[in-house]
């Protein structure tokens, strides 16, 4: 028998090791790779479909309080943040000009009353004179010219009284206006509210020639108005009466609720995107909400109590209108199902048919080496 050298034996041993290693590697590669399934159970729970938006808070009632007469703002009785009651004195404009106007009109009225007394006396005299002339005319002891003169004089005196009466009425109206202007120098609160802005400072002069200059702004903070900016894709699904709620950044755990009031028809363009203002009111008895706060708004489109629910991640290929393919893991094996879904939100979908509560639906799959 031929003896192998030491080198040949080493080569044969190396080849044997390679053959054995290759066999095990090939066996490993040909073996089926175990699949790890991530599944979620089909459950019963309440499901809502919402439109999400960002909005701003404003007061339902906000009034600019202005001056209706010109003059210097002599006194300002409030500061920003003060709560005022309806009728409370807020500011006063220098009343001297209005007071002088009243004095002038009263003097004019007094003079007109004196003129009227004189005119009435002259009218009485003219009436008596005409009567006397008419009696004399019957006796034919007065000329026709004198009689006509007496008639004319009576008419003139009567017209003079009428003119003075008209002037008196005009002066009375001017006096009423002057008194109203004096009242206007006292600026009072038209409603209960908080002073949220002061536009004119004490000592400044206001001119009310064309429009009432603004002195300050009052806001009724007991009820707030939420204006949510809703995209044009979502606004077609909204209608007044829908439930709406929101949270604010300062207290994200507290939710404020209301009912959608209206949707403004005029859009707002922001970076080439179109948004519409959906508005609703919320009570603010504790004054927690403030002007221009940012609101994270949710408007409820639909709600199903105790719906059959699966995550959106479980939905496979779309098979038709609201019909999808879903894979169920049953006894370790995949089973394809066709399901019909109802409402959905950004996370879950309602199952109308095709699945039962408790079944496991596959949301992802991967091999043993997958992270």
Curated annotation (Swiss-Prot):
Pfam families attached to this UniProt entry: HlyD_D23
Membrane disposition: Single-pass membrane protein
Annotated coiled-coil segments of the chain: 94-127
Top-level taxon of origin: Bacteria
Subcellular location field: Cell inner membrane
MF terms (GO), sorted A to Z: efflux transmembrane transporter activity
UniProt entry keywords in alphabetical sequence: Antibiotic resistance, Cell inner membrane, Cell membrane, Coiled coil, Membrane, Transmembrane, Transmembrane helix, Transport
TM stretches of this protein: 11-31
GO cellular component: efflux pump complex; extrinsic component of membrane; macrolide transmembrane transporter complex; plasma membrane
Side Periplasmic, residues: 32-371
Gene3D superfamilies: 2.40.30.170, 2.40.420.20, 2.40.50.100, 6.10.140.1990
Entry's Gene Ontology BP terms: response to antibiotic; xenobiotic detoxification by transmembrane export across the plasma membrane
InterPro entries assigned: CusB_D23, MacA_alpha-hairpin_sf, RND_pump_MFP
Intervals, Cytoplasmic compartment: 1-10
Subunit structure: Homohexamer. Part of the tripartite efflux system MacAB-TolC, which is composed of an inner membrane transporter, MacB, a periplasmic membrane fusion protein, MacA, and an outer membrane component, TolC. The complex forms a large protein conduit and can translocate molecules across both the inner and outer membranes. MacA interacts with MacB and TolC.
Family: Belongs to the membrane fusion protein (MFP) (TC 8.A.1) family.
NCBIfam families, alphabetized: PRK11578.1, RND_mfp
General function of this protein: Part of the tripartite efflux system MacAB-TolC. MacA stimulates the ATPase activity of MacB by promoting the closed ATP-bound state of MacB, increases the capacity of MacB to bind macrolides such as erythromycin, and provides a physical link between MacB and TolC. Confers resistance against macrolides.
Protein name, entry field: Macrolide export protein MacA
Organism of provenance: Yersinia pestis
């Amino acid at each position: 028998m031929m003896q192998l050298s030491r080198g040949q034996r080493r080569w044969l041993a190396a080849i044997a090791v390679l053959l054995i290693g290759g066999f095990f590697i090939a066996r490993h590669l040909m073996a089926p790779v175990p699949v790890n399934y991530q599944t979620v159970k089909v459950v019963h729970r309440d499901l809502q479909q919402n439109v999400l938006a960002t909005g701003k808070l404003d007061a339902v009632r906000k009034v600019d309080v202005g001056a209706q007469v010109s003059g210097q703002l002599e006194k300002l009785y409030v500061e920003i943040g003060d709560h005022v009651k309806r009728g409370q004195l807020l500011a006063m404009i220098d009343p001297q000009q209005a007071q002088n106007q009243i004095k002038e009109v009263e003097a004019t009225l007094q003079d007109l009353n004196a003129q009227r007394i004189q005119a009435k006396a002259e009218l009485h005299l003219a009436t008596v004179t005409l009567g006397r002339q008419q009696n004399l005319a019957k006796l034919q002891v007065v000329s026709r010219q004198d009689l006509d003169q007496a008639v004319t004089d009576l008419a003139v005196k009567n017209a003079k009284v009428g003119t003075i009466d008209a002037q008196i009425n005009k002066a009375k109206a001017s006096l009423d206006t002057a008194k109203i202007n004096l009242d206007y120098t006292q600026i009072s609160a038209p409603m209960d509210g908080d002073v949220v802005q002061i536009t004119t400072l004490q000592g400044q002069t206001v001119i009310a020639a064309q429009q009432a200059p603004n002195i300050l702004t009052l806001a009724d903070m007991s009820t707030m108005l939420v204006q949510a900016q809703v995209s044009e894709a979502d606004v077609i699904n909204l209608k007044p009466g829908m439930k709406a709620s929101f949270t604010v950044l300062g207290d994200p755990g507290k939710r404020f609720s209301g009912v959608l009031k209206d949707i403004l028809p005029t859009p707002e363009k922001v970076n080439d995107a179109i948004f519409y203002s959906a508005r609703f009111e919320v009570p603010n008895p504790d004054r927690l909400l403030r002007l221009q706060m940012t609101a994270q708004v949710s408007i409820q489109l639909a709600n199903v109590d105790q719906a059959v629910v699966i995550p959106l991640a479980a939905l496979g290929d779309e098979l038709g209108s609201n019909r999808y393919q879903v894979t169920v893991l049953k006894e370790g094996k995949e089973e394809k199902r066709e399901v019909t879904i109802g409402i959905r939100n950004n996370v879950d979908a309602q199952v109308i048919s095709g699945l039962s509560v408790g079944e496991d639906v596959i949301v992802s799959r991967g091999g043993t080496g997958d992270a």
